[in-house]
Amino acid sequence: MARRRDAGGRNLIERLRRRPALLAPRAVPRADNALLGMEQRRRRRRWAVLAISVVAFADVVGAVVPRTRGHLAILERNFPLGLSEGGRALLLVAGLLLLLLARGLARGYRRAWVGALFLTVASAVLHLAGNLDLIAAGLALVPPVYLWTIRDAFVAHARPLTVRSVLVIPWFFGGLLLYGLVGWSELAEQLPNRSFGARISTILRSAFFLTTAPGGDTALARAFIRSLQLFGAASLLVLAALLLQPVVARLTHHADTGARVRFLDKWGRTGMAALAGLPENDALELADGKVLLGYREISGVAIGVGDPVGEPGTEQQALGDFVTTCERHGWTPVLLAASHATAEHARRFGFESVAIGEEAVVDLQDFSTAGKERAKLRQNNHRAERDGVVVMPYRSADRTPTVDAQLREISDEWLRLKHGPELGFTLGRLDLDTFDLYETWIALVGGRVVAFTTWLPYLDGKAVILDLVRRHSDSPVGTMELLIVRSLESFRDRGLKEASLNGIPLACVDRPVPEGAEAEADSRLRDALRWLYDHGGAVYEAKNLFRFKSKFAPRWEPMYLVYPESANLARIATTVGLAYLPNGVVATLRGLVRRDRKPPPPCSAPDSSPPSAGAPGTST
């Protein structure tokens, strides 16, 4: 099997090489070995980055290491001294630019490939002109040959220069001219006497190493000329950074939220499908528009929410398209909270997977609070009813400014108790402007709202998933249990098949791994997740949330993190955490540090209340 895969990957590369276009990005065809081809190209890019880094190091060393008198004498006999000095300065710029291009090469940017090809050849010329170094020049010519042979490994698009980015360039030129003219005026007696126009020309040409810099009569004047060259080098670096910004592809925009939710409702088979349509997420259209995948891109990692959602039979094509799209944009493809079926299918593509949590799903056909396994649930419900808690749906026709204000008050207090802003990604937020996309239930005491929940549909309207779960700090014990139970009973009476209470990260890590399910998973990663589950209560109360949802006697469905075999798991874990944070990342982290150790008043029995902290998958 491995030989057939390798042969398929080689055939794919050979077909790509035979394409006539030379500098245009090569399209990666949709195929079963899409991930295999991506991994092969990634390994080749790593070798390219190593080779480029060696040349960049040689460039910097060749530019800054002092030359001996004998070396200078040889240079003076063969080259004008000004040309030699200019070559050394350009060599430094070339080395710095190559280092800047290294990250773009690793991501597969075509622009980075073109730039590296040019700069390595230029480095060879500059090593000859600046230092007459035949060894370094020969070394610099090796990477461009290798880059040319693996040109099909660079298919990613960098973001086109925007108007805002282009406007930065005149500011740099203007600042350079202003700085140069003011400095020349201050040092007029120590610099050559030139006209105003000649000064402008000399400043620009000197800054970008297009001519020999004018000499100065004093050390201060010579330092001023060197500062112009540093300014020019910095400008080139900024321009290179602007050219290599990653693409941010929003193929489905926030304005499409309503249509996106309806599509995910129709074709979604798991609760995560509904969360993929939350307004802050972007979406990729895969399999010729037949499949939708909600995602967020953070630092070059595209994190898909759950499974790709679409018509049956499109799973293979959708996964191949996801890999291809990510490679074209320089992203690492990842699926967060994918189902067991998707994880199995992805492993056949060459992905790795590890169980990271479980989803609590309640079968509604025979749901009731009767029986021993839901005895604790009955007790909490009776207690809440004795305290006067009344539960009802809150529909668009019933909306009032008073109730809306009370919902906002509860949500604001909940945020204050957890010392942070609203999170996002797979966590919903209270947005009354999109009220009709949710089904909302409220709990009242004496006509005042003390808690509420929101639900999102999936399975073509035959199932719902719990999104927001928020309560007032003085809500009676058992309020949340009663609120959820009455919602579930209503869903059952309306003929719905199931209701997801959402996922619990880390909930499965203390259970044995099913035979063959995660043969490739890193045991050290599972050990780390298990430790976090056992000791991470200060950060995320997974155990409390698991105990709370267990009272509903759900069935537990595993959720997986699916990632390429060669991916950096530490980087993926970091980007997943950042995906949940809004723009105020610093404020969120500061809030976690300042979190009050005293928990809010319980809404249930002290040993089984839902945690007050938000969690990936459920805002409780």
Predicted regions and their residues:
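Short, flexible active-site-proximal loops enriched in glycine and acidic residues
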Residues: 112-113, 134-135, 333, 349-358
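Long, low-complexity, intrinsically disordered segments
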Residues: 607-620
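Topology signature of small-to-medium multi-pass alpha-helical membrane proteins
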Residues: 2-253, 616
